[in-house]
């Protein structure tokens, strides 16, 4: 009898202790009673360049890696395959030294491809940069132009090109003395059909030509492309290629995507917190966000590899 009683006593004691460990507490919300006033100025929105919230998102730029700076990294960083290793960081409070790693692209020129691998080649160079703050440019060597060679950019998962809408192209280009051909800008469908074509009128060989022109596609393509076409052998250097829809938020050049920005405007925020949180401090002090570098000519801006594992223009 004693052996049977002991287990029951233990269970009863356990249940009793559990009951005491969970006191009855409740939260009562009275929807009929008004609480403290919250100033309208306390309601705002937060923006940080995470997961292409800016490049490929709110920012209306259609070209990915427009200034060929995406492979630049701060001093002391290095890449192994698809991993970026930043310099070691010492915590300013604990003194702990941390090693981190971030994703890195293995594309030789992020965002850009050639229509042929045999008749032409491309590589990044810093020869005679247009801007010291954004020194990289693309050297395109055309070996055989029996079929014109195209330098292609698909943007961020394709460019949304709308029939009869106007798009503003700006390119900074320098043909070497051995290039005697023409350069043509093309808007292409996902299948490669030409939706718009415009000559890029180069006036000075061996010098940087900063050129702007408007283009209108004859059909809509949700995953369109931009191409620069070369029809002769020789070498051409490309420093900058930008394509914006003319219809941006409030029709501002170098502006925001109209559809996304209007949704944000409709929230009637009292303020915008920018540039965010972790982006401000950076992975290390060398790549912290410096807002003064985001001013001036977009072609002269260096961009930065951010805390969130991507380069931002």
Question: What function would you assign to each model-found segment?
Answer:
Residues 1-24:
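Bacterial Sec-dependent N-terminal signal peptides
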Residues 18-312:
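Extracellular and organelle-lumenal recognition/adhesion modules and their flexible linkers in secreted
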């Amino acid at each position: 009898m004693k052996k049977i009683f002991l287990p029951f006593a233990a269970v009863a004691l356990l249940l009793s202790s559990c009951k005491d460990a969970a006191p009855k507490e409740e939260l009562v919300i009275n929807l009929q009673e008004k609480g403290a006033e919250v100033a309208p100025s306390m309601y705002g929105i937060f923006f940080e360049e995470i997961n292409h919230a800016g490049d490929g998102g709110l920012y209306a730029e259609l070209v990915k890696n427009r200034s060929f700076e995406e492979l630049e990294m701060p001093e002391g960083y290095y890449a192994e395959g698809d991993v970026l290793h930043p310099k070691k960081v010492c915590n300013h409070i604990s003194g702990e030294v941390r090693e981190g790693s971030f994703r890195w692209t293995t594309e030789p020129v992020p965002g850009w491809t050639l229509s042929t691998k045999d008749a032409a080649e491309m590589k990044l160079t810093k020869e005679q940069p247009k801007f010291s703050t954004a020194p990289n440019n693309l050297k395109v060597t055309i070996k055989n132009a029996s079929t014109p060679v195209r330098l292609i950019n698909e943007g961020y998962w394709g460019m949304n090109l709308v029939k009869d809408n106007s798009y503003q192209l700006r390119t900074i280009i320098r043909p070497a003395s051995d290039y005697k051909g023409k350069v043509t800008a093309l808007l292409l469908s996902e299948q490669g059909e030409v939706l718009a074509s415009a000559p890029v009128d180069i006036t000075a060989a061996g010098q940087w030509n900063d050129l702007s022109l408007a283009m209108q596609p004859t059909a809509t393509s949700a995953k369109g492309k931009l191409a620069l076409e070369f029809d002769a052998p020789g070498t051409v250097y490309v420093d900058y290629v930008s394509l914006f829809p003319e219809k941006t938020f409030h029709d501002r050049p170098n502006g925001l995507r109209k559809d996304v920005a209007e949704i944000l405007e409709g929230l009637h925020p009292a303020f915008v917190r920018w540039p965010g949180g972790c982006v401000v401090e950076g992975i290390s002090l060398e790549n912290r966000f410096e807002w003064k570098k985001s001013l001036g000519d977009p072609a002269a801006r260096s961009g930065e590899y951010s805390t969130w594992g991507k380069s931002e223009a």
